[in-house]
Amino acid sequence: MPKHSKRYLEARKLVDRTKYYDLDEAIELVKKTATAKFDETIELHIQTGIDYRKPEQHIRGTIVLPHGTGKEVKVLVFAKGEKAKEALEAGADYVGAEDLVEKIEKEGFLDFDVAIATPDMMRIIGRLGKILGPRGLMPSPKSGTVTQEVAEAVKEFKKGRIEVRTDKTGNIHIPVGKRSFDNEKLKENIIAAIKQIMQMKPAGVKGQFIKKAVLSSTMGPGIKLNLQSLLKE
């Protein structure tokens, strides 16, 4: 059993672990349990009913949070010529081609949150799969990060589009804001996330798709959400 900090144990006393909370109450409570000295991220954890043994049921895509995550997103773009210029003008932090591939390979450069590529770049960045893949940074058509529309993609990821995927236990973890967000913004982000995840239900999933949803802060305990009321929002 991992040892929890005194702060965590105090926060856990505020949460009734047998209760499923309505969203408004859960948001109030998650803020009370976020007692660290930094502005903690509020996270939504969704347990899905997918069978992870079946690759066709794996979920990978992007969702848009109306109020963003509260984190400054660093975007890297693999592009050349006019597309490279468009990416820079749209606000990309790093733009390049072979030079960036080399920087990642030889220097271990990973100071970015999202990597976008034009389709013609895939042949030169394919060898980065072993580095970027495990970190969830490899450009992919499924996540909208392999595209000719680089300027639009850069702007969307800067504004609040985030990539989501199921982990090896079929769970999805989504940052939905910061403790400093007002309650209404957190609520709107959470509802938007749930609705968009519902639309990603793979065709082969039988039974209930979203089995459980839990809200927590970076350092705080989990707060179980009342799914019936949440799905009606």
UniProtKB/Swiss-Prot annotation:
Record-level Gene Ontology MF annotations: rRNA binding; structural constituent of ribosome; tRNA binding
Protein's name according to its UniProt entry: Large ribosomal subunit protein uL1
PANTHER family the record matches: 54S RIBOSOMAL PROTEIN L1, MITOCHONDRIAL, LARGE RIBOSOMAL SUBUNIT PROTEIN UL1M
Subunit architecture: Part of the 50S ribosomal subunit.
Coiled coil residues, start to end: none
Function: Binds directly to 23S rRNA. The L1 stalk is quite mobile in the ribosome, and is involved in E site tRNA release. Protein L1 is also a translational repressor protein, it controls the translation of the L11 operon by binding to its mRNA.
Presence of keyword Ligase: no
Biological process per Gene Ontology, one example term: regulation of translation
Pfam families with a match to the protein in the record: Ribosomal_L1
Lineage: Bacteria, Thermotogati, Thermotogota, Thermotogae, Thermotogales
Keywords: Repressor, Ribonucleoprotein, Ribosomal protein, RNA-binding, rRNA-binding, Translation regulation, tRNA-binding
GO-annotated cellular components: large ribosomal subunit
Family affiliation: Belongs to the universal ribosomal protein uL1 family.
InterPro entries in UniProt: Ribosom_uL1_bac-type, Ribosomal_uL1, Ribosomal_uL1-like, Ribosomal_uL1/biogenesis, Ribosomal_uL1_3-a/b-sand, Ribosomal_uL1_CS
